[in-house]
Swiss-Prot record:
One Pfam assignment: MMM1
Residues of the SMP-LTD domain: 130-380
Protein's membrane topology: Single-pass type I membrane protein
Keywords per UniProt: Endoplasmic reticulum, Lipid transport, Lipid-binding, Membrane, Transmembrane, Transmembrane helix, Transport
Function: Component of the ERMES/MDM complex, which serves as a molecular tether to connect the endoplasmic reticulum (ER) and mitochondria. Components of this complex are involved in the control of mitochondrial shape and protein biogenesis, and function in nonvesicular lipid trafficking between the ER and mitochondria. The mdm12-mmm1 subcomplex functions in the major beta-barrel assembly pathway that is responsible for biogenesis of all outer membrane beta-barrel proteins, and acts in a late step after the SAM complex.
Annotated protein name in UniProt: Maintenance of mitochondrial morphology protein 1
Extent of Pro residues compositional bias: 272-286
CDD domains in alphabetical order: SMP_Mmm1
Domain notes: The SMP-LTD domain is a barrel-like domain that can bind various types of glycerophospholipids in its interior and mediate their transfer between two adjacent bilayers.
Compositional bias of kind Basic and acidic residues: 413-427
PANTHER family: SMP-LTD DOMAIN-CONTAINING PROTEIN, TEX2 PROTEIN-RELATED
Length: 484
């Protein structure tokens, strides 16, 4: 029994397996944490910043993915696997992304398409979108017109670029002027003082066989009231029977635009669209034709110089996008026509002459810019080029190259600042020694002329004194009483 008591019970040895498991588990957890940190915090994609411009939009304006969107990885694999060629570098544009419904949906504009009527005409349904006021557009148009008026006055002494020479050449075109009318002299031109006001702009969709899904068209109301927009001419009617110039009847006319209002339609004509069928214009007179050829050559040389400065090859025959504009037939054009016929026995303000002139002016206007006829104007090239890069004057921070370009611009614009003191109402005059005088009431209008390319008018300012004589004076006439 003592032997059993003295016998010690062996203590089982502590296994070191639990320590190894804990060590490995700790290391594995640390590795997992580091891997998760690297994956989600370092290589993870940052969330897109919230857009401040679209924060006020409703949730219904969220953009939806296009049905033409492909997998990003698939696109990358294909772009890396396939070697692009010159013909497939530019991806084709889906036709559904350029139609009117897609454009209206992506720009959040609700427009009702037009429905064709029984007679084949398009019945216009106004958009449910709120019409635009176009106040900003009126300011830009007013600045553009004011710049044209100032430029026309600065170029009044140019022998080839003045509006007076261009008008005289267009009015005396031998292919259009009848043989019984003598040489037409422009005696007074006024470009006006007011500006057109555009309002109530809305977008509609019209059917167009040349484009998929129709074509979008902007309609805006325009109103112009200016009593200083006028032109005055003098000429003579020739009686060529029984012999040439057997009798001469002096005639003086003054046409003024009292008011113009209508609905302007503007739409974009893509470059792929075939050009609209327009009647071929008659050839211009030699002087105007020479000027137009010189201007076209100068513009082509300027564009070529810009492209060479940018290191780009010159464009040859590249298509251009165009803007087509016209007026609806329900326009309003009020004219004021003053006439003076005769030398000794003078007839003043003959109603029949006023009716003939107004009818001809309306016909001239409708043949050019009234539906279904439109005017197509090519959009300018807006690609940034070094040849037409400038620096705004008055900037404090400028480099040496900017200072050099600024000095060059200031030299070019030095003459333009001389015309800042001129009033907005500018008036052309030709033949100051012999011209009929008209009163200053309702000086506004256009005349039935082919103006051609009128880039620069010659203008002479005239202060509106209001003391002009109500009596017409014809060149070479006596001071007798006027017969009405």
């Amino acid at each position: 029994m003592s032997f059993q008591q003295s016998e010690t019970v062996p203590v089982p040895a502590q296994s070191s397996l639990s320590f190894t498991q804990g060590f490995l588990l700790g290391q594995l957890s640390v590795v997992l944490l580091i891997g998760a940190f690297i994956k989600f915090f370092i290589f993870g994609e940052a969330p897109p910043p919230p857009s401040r411009g679209l924060s006020h939009r409703a949730s219904t304006h969220r953009r939806s993915n296009s049905i033409y969107t492909i997998n990003h990885n698939e696109a990358n694999n294909r772009s890396l696997r396939e070697k692009p060629s010159n013909s497939n570098v530019l991806r084709p544009v889906p036709s559904s992304s350029t139609n009117t419904r897609s454009i209206l949906r992506k720009t959040y504009y609700s427009a009702i398409p037009t429905n064709p009527s029984k007679h084949g005409r398009h019945k216009i349904h106004h958009s449910s979108h709120q019409p635009e006021s176009l106040d900003w557009f009126n300011v830009l148009i007013a600045q553009t017109i004011a710049q044209y008026r100032q430029t026309a006055y600065l170029l009044k002494d140019s022998p080839t670029s003045s509006i007076l020479s261009s008008l005289n050449a267009a009015l005396n075109n031998p292919e259009k002027k009848p043989s019984f009318i003598d040489k037409i002299n422009v005696t007074d031109i006024s470009l006006g003082e007011e500006f057109p006001i555009f309002s109530n702009c809305r977008i509609i969709a019209v059917d167009d066989p040349n484009s998929d899904g129709g074509r979008l068209q902007a309609l805006m109301d325009v109103d112009l009231s200016d009593d200083n927009l006028s032109i005055a001419i003098e000429t003579s009617l020739l009686l060529n029977y029984p012999k040439p110039c057997s009798a001469i009847l002096p005639v003086a006319l003054s046409v003024s635009v009292v008011r113009f209002s209508g609905t302007l339609c503007i739409s974009l004509v893509p470059a792929s669209t075939p050009p609209l069928h327009t009647p071929s214009p008659s050839p211009s007179p030699p002087t105007a034709d020479g000027n137009s050829r010189g201007k076209t050559t100068g513009d082509a040389n300027a564009r070529a110089a810009d492209e060479e400065a940018d290191g780009l090859p010159p464009k040859t025959g590249s298509p251009k996008s165009n803007v087509a504009f016209s007026f609806l037939p329900d326009y309003r054009l009020d004219l004021s026509v003053r006439s003076l016929i005769g030398s000794r026995s003078r007839l003043q303000d003959v109603p029949k002459v006023a009716q003939l002139v107004e009818a001809r002016v309306h016909a001239w206007f409708e043949e050019r810019v009234v539906e279904p006829r439109v005017q197509v104007v090519g959009l300018p090239d807006l690609w940034p080029r070094m040849g037409r890069t400038g620096v705004r004057t008055g900037d404090d921070s400028e480099t040496g190259s900017n200072a050099a370009s600024r000095s060059a611009m200031s030299a070019d614009l030095g003459d333009h600042h001389l015309g800042d003191r001129e009033p907005e109402g500018l008036r052309f005059r030709g033949g100051l020694a012999s011209r009929p005088q008209f009163d200053s009431v309702s000086r506004t209008s256009s005349y039935n002329v082919e103006t051609g390319d009128l880039r620069s008018p010659s203008l002479i300012r005239e202060e509106s004194s209001g003391a002009l004589s109500e009596q017409f004076q014809m060149p070479g006439s006596l001071s007798g009483a006027a017969a009405r």
